[in-house]
């Protein structure tokens, strides 16, 4: 659990110009399971790293302004405690994926992930299994049912509470 920031919900930053590839992670963010930030360039990611504690970085190999490998090296020099994964298009188990894993390891990445990236992938990257996350939420006073409510239902409950309070 020492890999997570002070917030219970992990802060995850995706740096990839192809935003549409992260639908499953966006769904997890809407459920309150992760705080998801998406950027398309390395410069934007570095600015964010100055302002926010990040638990996991997911970095595509090709960015708008630099290579993903260069960004991994820059982030490692600034935020060594955060987990960093390279996102590759190659199928896990393929020869190209094995080469990508070697290259990513050489620049300091903790893992190589392939699409679709799921909440389970992030839990493995952070070293925090789902059962332990449930315990962390319960210990923090969050009801399990509250954490899994869709945003629409949560927003409706807040609206009703505001109307009742005046």
Regions found by a protein language model. Name each.
Residues 17, 87-94, 116:
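Conserved active-site segment of CheY-like receiver
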Residues 18-37:
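Two-component/phosphorelay signaling modules centered on CheY-like receiver
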Residues 27-29, 48, 103:
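Alpha-helical interaction/dimerization surfaces of two-component signaling modules
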Residues 54, 68, 99-112:
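As written
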Residues 131-165:
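CheY-like receiver
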